Amino acid sequence: MSNSIVIIGSGFAARQLVKNIRKQDASIPLTLIAADSMDEYNKPDLSHVISQGQRADDLTRQTAGEFAEQFNLRLFPHTWVTDIDAEAHVVKSQNNQWQYDKLVLATGASAFVPPVPGRELMLTLNSQQEYRACETQLRDARRVLIVGGGLIGIELAMDFCRAGKAVTLIDNAASILASLMLPEVSSRLQHRLTEMGVHLLLKSQLQGLEKTDSGILATLDRQRSIEVDAVIAATGLRPETALARRAGLTINRGVCVDSYLQTSNADIYALGDCAEINGQVLPFLQPIQLSAMVLAKNLLGNNTPLKLPAMLVKIKTPELPLHLAGETQRQDLRWQINTERQGMVARGVDDGDQLRAFVVSEDRMKEAFGLLKTLPM
């Protein structure tokens, strides 16, 4: 059995793993190393900080010191890991090194910033640290441009709009949430955003940003431009794989792991947003929780495979909340859409009339768990 576990990272995945390990073993040596402060906060809250008037420090739930004391840990905050010597089982920073028996990479994912001229003017909201760096600018901004119409983009667009700001959202696609669902399914939310006053620039492309005396000039395709006070990149996340790559691990979109969360090195595991589990990157809370439960067992000597059930994804748009599950992005499904004043139920079925995906909104969200049970594993 392992007698020394080192975890690189301090986010939701790392903390879930620590809690699950400590439920089973109170004394095994645990060391966490991370580049941030290691204070705990709820990352989904970042989608609502502006309308709720929260400062970055308001998000803190537990300090690093309290976490270390509660779970009997050695913590090394504000520490950049530079290398992993997989053969010697050593993790290195500029001024320190740690021996491990088992190593877990929980390095998360970073916000992708489109490579356009002036990209340094774009803000990202992927961590408490990032919000702390730009909270004054965002609070003071009257005009906000959000680049990207996916999950995070529409959540932020609604939140900034609810806070009374003039919001423009730009995306290359013809509809919002284009990578998740067809336009006929997302149209209810798209209409609500427009009703609220969000200016949607779909089938549009950001070409560059330039600082001006009165704000930021965003140049778009088709000889268009708009001036705003802040620009937020919400164009997706990229798993942090640089450290794993330097350690010689197999990398695809994320750090490749099998059903046991094991990488191509038998003593190194990966968990959370940085991990690609049997070809899938799953940056949502429920698969991370289930993965942490399984990995804790395996680090303590078990051999338990991860089995993920059909899972709900919740879109945090309070004016028109949505839950979805299954293969909503499949192009070959027939969608049966029932829309009422209280909400929508959209069912995606295959050629054999088997339910493969669904999207529910508002008061109809209470039907989600019944539908979830009918989805194939």
Curated annotation (Swiss-Prot):
Keywords linked to the UniProt accession? Cytoplasm, FAD, Flavoprotein, NAD, Oxidoreductase
Q: Which PANTHER family match?
A: NITRITE REDUCTASE [NAD(P)H] (PTHR43429:SF3), PYRIDINE NUCLEOTIDE-DISULFIDE OXIDOREDUCTASE DOMAIN-CONTAINING (PTHR43429)
Question: Out of the domains of life, which is the source?
Answer: Bacteria
Required cofactor names: FAD
Q: Name one GO molecular function term.
A: oxidoreductase activity, acting on iron-sulfur proteins as donors, NAD or NADP as acceptor
| Reactions that this protein is recorded to catalyse | 2 reduced [nitric oxide reductase rubredoxin domain] + NAD(+) + H(+) = 2 oxidized [nitric oxide reductase rubredoxin domain] + NADH
The EC number on file is 1.18.1.-
Pathway connected to this protein? Nitrogen metabolism; nitric oxide reduction
Report the locations given in the UniProt record: Cytoplasm
What is the species listed in this Swiss-Prot or TrEMBL entry?
A: Escherichia coli O7:K1 (strain IAI39 / ExPEC)
Q: What coarse category fits the chief subcellular location reported for this protein?
A: cytoplasm
The protein here is known as: Nitric oxide reductase FlRd-NAD(+) reductase
InterPro entries of this UniProt entry?
A: FAD-bd_OxRdtase, FAD/NAD-bd_sf, FAD/NAD-binding_dom, NO_rdtase_NorW, Rbx-bd
Role this protein plays: One of at least two accessory proteins for anaerobic nitric oxide (NO) reductase. Reduces the rubredoxin moiety of NO reductase.
GO CC aspect terms: cytoplasm
Q: Which HAMAP family does the UniProt entry name for this protein? A: NorW
Looking up Gene3D superfamilies in the UniProt record yields:
3.30.390.120, FAD/NAD(P)-binding domain
Question: Does the keyword Nucleotide-binding belong to this entry?
Answer: no
Would the keyword DNA-binding be found if you checked this record's keyword annotation? no
